[in-house]
Amino acid sequence: MSAVDTAWLRMDGPAGAMMIVSVMATATPVCAAELRRVLETRLLCFPRFRRRVEADPLGASWIDDGDIDLDAHFVVTRLPGKGGKHELQALAARLAAERLDPSRPLWQIHFVERYGSGSAWILRLHHCYADGIAMIRVLLSLTEQDAGPAQAGAQDAESRAGQRRDQGTTDPPPLRDWINQFSQPAGDILEHALAEGARLLEAGVHRLFHPDTAATVALQASGMVGEFAKVLALPDDPASPLRASLSGEKGVAWSEPLDLQEVKTVSRALGCTVNDVLMATVAGTLGAYLREEHEFDTAGVVLRASVPVNLRAAEEAMTLGNKFGLMFVDLPVGVANPLQRAYAMHDTMRELKGSLQPQLTLTVLGTLGMLPAVAQGPAIELFSRKGSLVASNVPGPQTPLCICGQRISEMYFWVPQSGSIGVGVSILSYAGKVFFGLIADRACVAEPQRVVDRLGPEFEQLLLAATVGALGLEQRNRATKSAGKPRQRKRRATPTKARRKTRPPAGNT
């Protein structure tokens, strides 16, 4: 097992295990037997899903599990009562707090054959197997492109998989498109971090055999050292209801999805990125929750979020494991004005462009994974005190996908919270919608639904403010252009008294 994956394995603590949790749903029912066949043919082809973990104080190893018992990993269950959203959230929360069986490969799917008018399933995967991006890649490998009800219903899972093999492809077009999209450098952050990381890794090997180049290596590493000093100098996040002694009891909730086009409308109107708009909406939601539910004075308060940043090169997009770093992002929860909050978020993200924090944290995790397990806990706690939540934003495929011939209508995921952090926010865009989810230790957020219910209204306020502001700006621009044009006097015959009209008073036109 790699050092970084080992570090994630060791982060399990009394308050919970480091599991990624995903919930997906279809509007029409999926057959359990057919989904099981899909798992056999498409999921178990990943060797890591057939392997269990064997750990010792110095590291961990992957052990082949032989003939894997799929029945232990694919559990068919029923929801109590009405079998709706509330019941599915309760099941997801319970499973998020339960540990996976360490004697087996560390993943499990609970399939709900009847959820509303369709079906749903909850995937749990230990973070040492894959990060969020890799997990979504695995989930998408189980799907196929939405080809319409008639065609989708006519083909079963095995024939669709065989069809792709005959065409010489291993993944459906939406997955390849998504991988290509996500593997593009996400602004200067990834581009700079990848370049610097590659230089440092190469220099690290070279200096073992060429001590005379130590000065050059030191210059190349100075940026990383400086970034490390900045991170260490960050103060602990301020005390708030979101930081409490963790209980280990989880709560899960999600909101109604936002329209991605409306989010893009706001981003264009404000000159911000889509990510700026979404993170500003999260900040506004948390601020409103703290003020209204806890009577917490947020004036001037900034809470820090730990944000995962993908560091996979394009050629590594199809591999499992952990290839991401973390970045500490200030959330302006104390800014009540939605426009000011969006601009503050934009300024924060702009200042972080070119930051080496993602590569730095990946390097730190790799180092911790190579040290004895006893040394890891204090270091993780040191970093976790600098934030109040984990916020993950993943751009998913915009082409609708199907599984077992049924269209996927909802898609949520949550990454684990390490150390003393007890709140996690997830953002996933899929098929023209933006899905928000919240997972939290009950000691930090007793009722997560009370948080996510505020997200829609917060975005509506931002949308309205941006729209009104854009209209006002357009009117001012038109007036400015009109005032700047010289008037041309037209010659005309002097009107007769019968044709004269009274000019409207100035200001009424």
Question: Model regions: which residues?
Answer:
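Soluble acyl-CoA-dependent acyltransferase catalytic core bearing the H(X)4D motif
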Residues: 1-4, 12, 17, 21-421, ...
